[in-house]
Amino acid sequence: MKLKSVSTYCQSAMSAGLIYTRDENGEIIRQHLVCRQMIVPLDGMPVISGDQLPALLDVPEEKRDAWFVSRIERDEGTGKELSWMLEDRQPGNIPAILLPMTLAVNDVIVQPVMDEACVARMQFVRVDALKVTDDIKKERTYALRSRDGRTVLMVMKGMTARAAIMTDTAWISEAANEWLECLTNEAARVVRERGKDERAEGR
């Protein structure tokens, strides 16, 4: 994605964030630009600070004070359960959890991130590849199916499938399995209740 397109998207949202990935020595080894559900790698560029980000995106100087700029720190560490914290100019911190699992989407390995609005952001995946609406107020339903020994996570909007995410079982941790089980149980409950309502209406 070209930086100009990224800039236009970020300016429409009036927000942007930086993801810093550090090694065990604390050195920044990679950085990403994040806006809503879009995450773009900034490979080959010098380390960018939050103060430099609006200038990089060509935001007019007189409009920069109205922008929401966040910083996300990721600690490589042991590679186990990781947590991210968004630090912003607002009072308090907004937690964002990097779920302890990796997924294979369109032959690309990704990791889902759950933020304060419970929106899953997929690292290294284009927004249109997931086809999940930006409107966090719209209901989402999750269902799980097994295929060739692997688990497929279906993201539903009503009765329409919005995304199919196949998990890489070799990377799934116990915590991730518990998370998937919770989704399965919730999806089953929704289906059961919907079936009861439909049968009641039929009578």
Per-segment meaning from a language model:
Residues 41-58:
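Conserved mixed alpha/beta catalytic, RNA-binding, or beta-rich assembly cores of soluble enzyme
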Residues 33-38, 55-203:
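C-terminal functional regions that serve as terminal interaction/effector modules
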Residues 1-28, 32-42:
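Intrinsically disordered, low-complexity linker/loop segments enriched in Gly/Pro
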